[in-house]
A protein has these predicted regions:
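Bacterial Sec-dependent N-terminal signal peptides
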Residues: 1-21
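A generic structural signal for alpha->beta connector loops
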Residues: 14-17, 196, 268, 306
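Compositionally biased, intrinsically disordered or flexible polar/acidic segments
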Residues: 19-180
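Conserved beta-strand scaffold positions in the cores of enzyme catalytic domains, especially
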Residues: 22, 199-201, 306-309
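Acidic/histidine-rich helix-loop elements
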Residues: 35-51, 176-181, 201-216, 239-248
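Alpha-helical cap/lid subdomain in secreted, periplasmic
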Residues: 90, 216-382, 386, 390, ...
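Short, well-ordered coil/turn elements that cap or connect secondary structure elements
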Residues: 139, 161, 194-196, 266, ...
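Serine-esterase "nucleophile elbow" of acetyl-processing enzymes
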Residues: 144, 148-204, 217-231
């Protein structure tokens, strides 16, 4: 696994790292190390035979770069063989869905990847959790994952990108989940935007609005933010479990939401609230409310402070009720024992989404942005199609080649 960059190394990146870097993936490339600054990572280096006849497994390629937004241009396919490739970045952020190419067929795509470390300044860093130290999102490199039944990448170009950024704040329903079969809408959200927008997901499992602030995550965002950037905040799941003095929807939670508003606006950013996703809790075919006053408290703060709201709470209720009590399990981490390597017990989680569920929820977020008339929806990809949670996509057509890292333990939060 990749090591976190130390604060002392943060200032030592060479100027060359800021320029465009192009890699010919048809020839042998080294195994990544910090002194070289690029190479195959995470899994075994492709063999000469694999490069000649084609891969049948996922591979990762990393490039050492400073914090920031990077336009990544990949040419996928091969002149030697037919291929099937999906492209993700960092912690399984989806950019290109599985795409088949014929022998000799090459296709080029561009997208923007946000890369960061915990470093803020010489006196402050993000206080990440122990589990985050193995994440591909907090280290000193930008990592691309090439997956699929026969992944093929011909070339990679990486260059700095000066584009608007959408920052995501939240908990386990938003975070870039690092391991199968867990997923959240934040890591699917990247799929829908062209190379004129960056998505920077700072959410983490188990966080409340208060612990997000206390761990310096908003401070990190503010150091990266430019005037006109966006900040989306989804909280409420874990906040309702706080028991300290002053906790509750109408005091501590509301007060912390106001802190987000004030700090983002002070830095000339645009803040948007997202009401929490529903839990799968049915009675007589209807979803039962489990979040208490927290969604209403968020709405009240938003109304008072003139903050736009994406009603994910309502959309996910419609989504679950449309699927029904049994079929709604398909959107969440419900799997029989033995479904995944090393999984000796059944998984039954009514809060956390699997990849299909997260993909569907990401579409709800985009629809919420469209309904609010946000200018950044002009950067939606040409293949975007409007979505309704009352008409979900066909689960049986979902295709997600598994990343090679699995975990049976639930993410923090419930």
């Amino acid at each position: 696994m990749k090591k976190l960059i130390s604060t002392t190394l943060a200032s030592l990146f060479c100027v060359a790292c800021l320029n465009a870097q192009t890699f010919d993936m048809k020839v042998a490339q080294p195994c990544y190390n910090d002194s070289i600054g690029y190479g195959w990572d995470v899994t075994n280096v492709p063999t000469a035979k694999e490069l000649k006849k084609g891969l049948k497994r996922p591979v990762y390629f990393s490039v050492k770069v400073p914090d920031g937004n990077y336009k990544v241009t990949v040419t996928i396919g091969s002149k030697k063989y037919a291929a099937n490739t999906t492209v993700r970045a960092e912690n399984r952020r989806l950019f290109i869905e599985p795409l088949s190419t014929k022998k000799g067929e090459l296709k080029t795509f561009s997208f923007v990847v946000n890369k960061r470390t915990p470093y803020i300044n010489n006196k402050m860093s993000v206080r990440i959790k122990e589990r985050e130290k193995d994440y591909l999102t907090w280290d000193n490199r930008l990592t691309l994952e090439f997956n699929g039944t026969a992944p093929a990448v011909a070339s990679i170009n990486i260059e700095k990108a000066d584009v608007p950024t959408v920052f995501l704040c939240g908990n386990s329903t938003v975070v870039d989940q690092s391991r199968e079969p867990w997923a959240s809408w934040g890591q699917m959200f990247t799929r829908w935007f062209d190379d004129g927008i960056a998505i920077s997901n700072h959410a983490e499992s188990g966080l409340t609005a208060g612990s997000f602030l206390a761990s310096n995550r908003l401070e990190k965002i503010l150091t990266m933010m430019k005037p006109g950037d966006y900040v989306l905040c989804e909280f409420g799941h874990n906040d309702q479990k706080e028991k300290m003095a002053g906790s509750g929807a109408w005091y501590n939670f509301s007060y912390n939401l106001k802190k987000f508003i004030d700090q983002v606006r002070k830095n000339k950013g645009n803040i948007i609230f997202v009401t929490p996703t529903q839990r799968r809790n049915f009675k007589d075919g209807k979803i039962q409310e489990t979040h208490g006053d927290y969604p209403d408290a968020m709405r009240a703060v938003a109304k008072r402070e003139h903050v736009p709201v994406i009603e994910l709470h309502d959309m996910t209720r419609t989504f679950f009720e449309t699927l029904g009590e049994e079929n709604s399990k398909r959107a969440l981490v419900h799997y029989a024992a033995g479904t995944f390597p090393g999984q000796d017990k059944a998984l039954a989680d009514n809060t956390h989404f699997n990849t299909w569920g997260a993909y569907e929820v990401s579409k709800m977020i985009v629809m919420g942005m469209k309904q609010l008339g946000l200018p950044i929806v002009s950067h939606l990809r040409p293949d975007w199609k409007d979505y309704s949670p009352a008409q979900p996509d066909d689960f049986n057509k979902w295709n997600w080649p598994l990343s090679p890292i699995f975990e049976s333990q639930k993410p923090d939060g419930n």
